[in-house]
Each structure stands twice: as structure tokens, then as C-alpha cells.
Regions:
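Hydrophobic, aromatic-rich transmembrane alpha-helices
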Residues: 87-108
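Transmembrane alpha-helix segments characteristic
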Residues: 44, 105-128
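Membrane-interface alpha helices of multi-pass inner-membrane proteins
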Residues: 1-13, 22-25, 43-45, 125
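Perimembrane helix-loop-helix junctions
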Residues: 18-44, 73, 99-105
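Signature aromatic-anchored transmembrane alpha helix within multi-pass, membrane-resident enzymes
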Residues: 155-185
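Hydrophobic/aromatic-rich transmembrane helices and adjacent perimembrane loops
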Residues: 131-159, 166
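Luminal/periplasmic acceptor-recognition loop/helix of membrane-associated glycosyltransferases
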Residues: 195-221, 225-272, 276
Length: 277
């Protein structure tokens, strides 16, 4: 089962390798266990199709993650990372976690692994800020260790336990309110995430059934397809990363057919007249 779990983590997110690494570091005796190597071989067999695909496409996503995201260092990478860290793990609970992690000892292999995963992810991505911006969601695997530490640290500390329970209920209520706003937008906020459906439906109406070619933005093409169910394509750009649209045959299928070219210019949307592509 360990081999299957490691393979599923690899398919889900490459950061799954960090989970395995930190588990091994928390219990080096695994390196003396033959079953661990059998699990690794099973993992390798299960991800072999993905590795073969990577080989056929010049290791495209590996190269992107190892080098394509590298940018000149900015202090804002560190400050934003720390702010996001507090926001993700709750600014009212994260200080408690830090104190609990320092005082709580892992008395079992599982607890040691959870402690190592939580600290390892936080420190690893803190170091990664020297190479570029770190996405907040990359820290999610550390959540399991944070929860375990908070639970253990509150044992025998009734006052602290009541504090965490209260903060937890308040947090759940706030998350529910944010979710309601994101789904229904009763406040009429103009943030991009709240206005996607209307703006992309506007483009779809102008396209009138024709495919839409987005100028260099694979995210806009993907969101257009999601919100409208219509055909979209992202024109490759030498100034931006490689996307899945460069691996598909959309340009061949759309050749010679009428299409709409969409270009973002600040807050304005310019839609060209139908042309032959």
C-alpha cells in the first residue's frame, strides 16, 4: 500500500516526494527495511507511464519546476510567504503551533513523521523564496502535522483547548461566509474571481460560436472553456511559460476556420473581427 500511496502522491503533485523524504528523515530505520525498497520499486513501476511521457516531451514539466520558475530574488517573496503562512494556518493558531512544535515530542514514528513534515515543508519553501514566489497552497501537506501538534499540545491544558475550540468555530464561520460570497457574490465585489462568469460569457457572446484564441494566456483560455464550455486556444508566447495548449493539436484542427482573437489590454477587452486562422 505504501508504494501505491507514493505513486498517487507523485501523480497528484510532485511535492509528494517531499512527504516521502521527510518521513524517511524522521525514521532513518526505514532505509534498513527491505519492504521500503519494494514499495519504491512499485512506485517507480506505477509512475513509469508518466516518466515515459516526460521523456517524449523533453522533461517539460520537470524542467519548468527546476528552472523555469526561477526569478531574481525579491524581499517581497519572503514577506508574502510568511504572511501567507500565517493566513493559511490561522494567525490566531499558528503561534500556538510553533510553541507546541517546540515542546511536543514525537513518541511514535507517526508523530515524528508528522512533526518532520510540518517543519520540513515550512522550512523548505521558506528556502525556496530565494528562487521565486511560493504559492500558498504548496504548504497544505504541512496541515496534518499542524493539527497533530495542536491536538497533542492541548492535552492537559484545558484553558488552551477552549481557546482553540473557540477560534476554530469562528474560523469555520468566517470560511462559510467567504464561500457564500465566492459562490453568490451578494456584496457585488469586483474582484476577478467573482466576475469570471460574466466576463467570459461576454466574450462567448461576441464569439458567436467561433473558437477564441487567447493571446499568450493559458489561464484565460482554460477559464473561458470552464465557464462557457466553448472551444478556446492559447497562442504560445516566447515571454511566457509553456502550456498544455502547445502539446495539443488545436492549432491544426482550427487551421482555416473562422476564429476570434482576444487580447487583454489593462482592463479593456479587445475582440478582433472574425478572421481566418
Amino acid at each position: 500500500w505504501m508504494g501505491i500511496a507514493m505513486a498517487l502522491m507523485a501523480y497528484s503533485k510532485y511535492h509528494g516526494a517531499l512527504v516521502v523524504l521527510f518521513i524517511v528523515l524522521s525514521n532513518l530505520r526505514l532505509l534498513k527495511n527491505p519492504k521500503f525498497y519494494v514499495a519504491c520499486l512499485l512506485t517507480l513501476a506505477l509512475i513509469a507511464p508518466h516518466l515515459w511521457w516526460q521523456y517524449q516531451h523533453d522533461w517539460i514539466s520537470f524542467r519548468y519546476h527546476l528552472d523555469g520558475r526561477t526569478r531574481d530574488f525579491e524581499y517581497s517573496f519572503v514577506t508574502e510567504y510568511l504572511l501567507n503562512l500565517f493566513a493559511i494556518f490561522n494567525p490566531f493558531l499558528f503561534p500556538v503551533f510553533l510553541k507546541g512544535w517546540w515542546k511536543t515530542k514525537g513518541h511514535t514514528p507517526v508523530l515524528r513523521a508528522l512533526n518532520c513534515i510540518s517543519a520540513g515543508f515550512i522550512l523548505f519553501f521558506l528556502a525556496s523564496t530565494t528562487r521565486g514566489y511560493v504559492q500558498p497552497q504548496w504548504e497544505i501537506p504541512a496541515t496534518f502535522g499542524v493539527i497533530a501538534v495542536l491536538y497533542l499540545f492541548t492535552q492537559g491544558r484545558e484553558r488552551l483547548r477552549r481557546y482553540i475550540v473557540r477560534v476554530g468555530w469562528i474560523t469555520i464561520a468566517l470560511i462559510a461566509l467567504v464561500r457564500i460570497e465566492m459562490i453568490f457574490n451578494p456584496l457585488g465585489l469586483k474582484f476577478e474571481v467573482f466576475d469570471n462568469r460574466a466576463s467570459y460569457n461576454e466574450i462567448a457572446a461576441a464569439a458567436d460560436g467561433r473558437p477564441v484564441i487567447f493571446d499568450g494566456s493559458y489561464t484565460d483560455a482554460a477559464k473561458y472553456g470552464f465557464y462557457t464550455g466553448r472551444t478556446a486556444y492559447a497562442q504560445p508566447s516566447i515571454r511566457y511559460r509553456t502550456s498544455q495548449y502547445e502539446l495539443k493539436d488545436d492549432d491544426d484542427r482550427m487551421a482555416g476556420k473562422p476564429a476570434i482573437l482576444q487580447v487583454w489590454d489593462l482592463s479593456l477587452i479587445h475582440i478582433s473581427e472574425p478572421t481566418r486562422h
